[in-house]
């Protein structure tokens, strides 16, 4: 639980950058994968109040923390794994995940689930910033290559990757769209 608080505080800048890359708009249905204590959801609601937010996280402790922060605002929180939870097909306009991708049990399966859950033309944004002892720009670039490969394997198009120097380490945000047809 303490790790969730620490990551949340360090993720504020990453959250804003990822939200900018995602381009949320009024009326969007958005899924956050790995919502932690709910700070990114809170930031999205500050930016655009008329969105429909859902979140999925494996941690019961994070679900309880996030519920106190965003539940009164009509956010739906789910305890579960992106790889196995039966998300509705073609339901979300946008999917966002910040510093969560590398802790999924199966990234390829998680990306395929995101693809299935997105509406045609929907967009996903996944950001990672290595925090391990061996964190380096090379590791960040490796994460980026893996995200691109997973997006391609799932059938996404318009895949883009951006890098940004945010302390303590170089960060990567990969975005991709589900084909409109």
Swiss-Prot record:
* Matches recorded under InterPro entries: Methyltransf_25, SAM-dependent_MTases_sf
Q: What class of enzyme is it?
A: transferase
Q: Report the source organism.
A: Bacillus subtilis (strain 168)
* One annotated GO biological process: methylation
Q: Which SUPFAM superfamilies match?
A: S-adenosyl-L-methionine-dependent methyltransferases
CDD domains under this entry?
Answer: AdoMet_MTases
Q: Name one GO molecular function term.
A: methyltransferase activity
Official protein name in the record: Uncharacterized methyltransferase YdaC
Give the source's domain of life in one word.
Bacteria
User: Does the keyword field hold Glycoprotein?
Assistant: no
Family statement? Belongs to the methyltransferase superfamily.
Keyword annotations for this protein? Methyltransferase, Transferase
Q: What is its EC number?
A: 2.1.1.-
